[in-house]
Amino acid sequence: ILSAMLAYKTLYWIIGFFFTRKFKPAKNKHKYGIVIAARNEEKVIGNLLDSINKQDYPKDLLTVFVVADNCTDNTAIEAKKAGAKVISCTEKVSTKGEVLKYTFDLFKDNNKIDAYAIFDADNIVHHDFLAKMNDMINSGYSVAQGFRDTKNISDNWLTSSYAILYYFQSLFLNESRYNMGRSSFLNGTGFVIKKEVIDKHGFNPKTVTEDVEFTAM
């Protein structure tokens, strides 16, 4: 049994490392609502929004929403300075998943959004992220997870460990499953999901690991 499990994992590693599926750049440009759940993130939200503003994607097709989750600092002010629209979430919420549900419910009847892009407030986004994600959506995928990396990989053993974990998840799990035509799993941030999926199936996670829970759904 152990040999079979090892062979199974080895096959995944080989496929993830040596093979890749190609897709054509999309001609059809979708409209994205970028959603950022933020609670007291005034020190980092500007860096994320700056990277979003530098995306290689038509700016008129992007709307950035910072959901200020019961903030007691200047997160909303910093977000507005960077051009984002601020949504004040004053309801009693305890998880990021609940904040996302609150936001998706607000936009249920909004026909100006084709898909959501989800980020954490301390992220920095590569300049071609949305262009690549649009290629995936235009190829027929309803959900797409981006590559996740660590900004401060050399700070200490913990950040280095996270970098290894993210690389393992992206290359040896998600990339392999994608190359085999199978479903991958969401990794909490840096993913895109078509609005029609949320509208049809809902988004009501019950745990703090909303990404894993929604993947299973």
How should each PLM-predicted stretch be described?
Residues 1-28, 79, 174:
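N-terminal membrane-anchoring/stem segments of glycan-assembly enzymes
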Residues 44-46, 73-80, 128:
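Acidic helix N-cap motif at the loop->helix transition within catalytic regions
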Residues 74, 120-136:
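Acidic donor-binding/catalytic loop of UDP-sugar-dependent glycosyltransferases
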Residues 88, 95-99, 103, 107-109, ...:
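Long helical/loop segments within the catalytic core of UDP-sugar-dependent glycosyltransferases
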Residues 68-76, 91-93, 124:
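A conserved acidic beta->alpha catalytic loop
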Residues 30-33, 63, 213:
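Cell-envelope/extracellular polymer assembly enzymes that use nucleotide-activated donors
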Residues 110-124:
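Short beta-strand-to-loop acidic/aromatic patch adjacent to the donor-nucleotide binding site
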Residues 50-61:
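Short, acidic, metal-binding catalytic loop of nucleotide-sugar glycosyltransferases
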